[in-house]
Amino acid sequence: VPAHEIGQCVVNELRRYGVDTKYLLRGGPRLGVYYCEKGASQRASKVIYDRAGSSIATAKAEEFDWDGIFEGADWFHWTGITPALGGEMPEACLQACKAAKEKGVTVSCDLNYRKKLWSREQAGEVMAKLLPYVDVCIANEEDAKDVFGIEAENTDINSGKLDHAGYISVARQIAQRFGCRKVAITLRGSLSASDNDWAGMLYDACLLYTSDAA
């Protein structure tokens, strides 16, 4: 985060919840932000990103002390939005994943594909290099298709139709292609721009766990 007062507000907010900020880097010109225009009825929500030139986007991969960061840690989670910010973030994520594995830290990742940040081709190329270091992959049917070309059979994303059997295939393909121990998939049945039915699925090798939609 930047070293000015706005950056300090971020640090203070994290500390408020007991988050250790010892290794949080300070520098760069500005804090990245985004704006959300909430949808209504059948009009979808709209997101506007304002992250160009932000502190995280301009950070250098070698600035992060991964050995120190992962000392005593047992879990490292990162999101697909981070490498999508460009610059040296893809390399920073790769170094982080490698360091975490060397320390015996469990690595989880949310694919979180955002087409406004990078193309499908860029996402597929970068994420394919990172996923082999991931133990737990969190995805949905759209991300799996956009990033890796993996589709849920008998499922229509646009209509919100859910078919659990199709998602088992998606989870299995991700696990087999990249060696992930577990794959979690969020299942959304779209009712309107503001109302959805949600369910979850966890694929663990040959075992499958699902929740009821709510």
What do the predicted segments below correspond to?
Residues 209-214:
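Conserved small/polar residues in nucleotide/adenosyl-binding loops
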Residues 2-81:
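Conserved N-terminal subdomain of the carbohydrate kinase-like
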Residues 117-205:
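Conserved phosphate/ATP/ADP-binding segment of small-molecule kinases
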Residues 39-41, 203-207:
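Short acidic-glycine loop/turn motifs at beta-strand connectors
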Residues 92-102, 126-133:
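Catalytic-core regions built around general acid/base machinery
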Residues 106-108:
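Short beta-strand/loop segments at the ligand-binding rim of alpha/beta enzyme cores
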Residues 53-57, 84-86, 113-118, 159-163:
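Short, flexible loop segments at the rims of nucleotide/cofactor-binding pockets, characterized by
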Residues 82-91, 119, 148:
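Glycine/threonine-rich flexible loop motifs
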